[in-house]
Amino acid sequence: MSYECFKLTLSEGIAHIRFNRPEKANSMIPSFWTELPTVVNELSRDASARVIVLSAEGRHFSSGMDISVFTEGGLDGPASGSRFVRAEAFRHHCMALQDAFTCLEEARMPVLVAIQGAAVGGAMDLITACVCRYASRDAFFSVHETAIGMTADVGTYPRLVKLIPEGWARQMSY
């Protein structure tokens, strides 16, 4: 199967998922959020993979969520309807985004991630959901949501404070 955001190879029990949008710094477009859980869940059901390795093509691991996630049928939700309907659509969308990374935690095999360059915003959410993280010397990390007035609500903080001291997690956020 082919994917817009990923290249998938499977060899000798190793499933290698590579982010494949280097021209856009591997930003997470709307299809990313459906493709990732599809790939991971299929591999989790398939007995031929013993481990999943995530990596990225290009200079940066990922620049995080693409702005189109907010506009193209994304967080905008329905334009009409009551405030309750819009709020419920927003909540449903956020839960779907969270589920895209929860599948990494729930996979039957370990998920490892190799990081180079930038790992910003949503990329931080993703790497905190993996079992092991390996970073190149040029890797840098940023929870960028707070800089633009957003809450990092795709799972960053609950996962991050399990990995590093809470003070460091707070410092990364500002």
Regions found by a protein language model. Give the residues of each.
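Hydrophobic/aromatic residues within transmembrane alpha-helices
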Residues: 17, 54, 66, 126-128
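Histidine-centered beta-alpha loop that forms part of the nucleotide-sugar donor binding/catalytic region
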Residues: 20, 65, 116
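Charged catalytic carboxylate motif
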Residues: 31, 35, 96, 103
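A short, glycine- and basic residue-enriched loop/turn
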Residues: 22-25, 59, 68, 138-140, ...
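Glycine- (often His-adjacent) and acidic-residue-rich active-site loop
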Residues: 56-99, 149
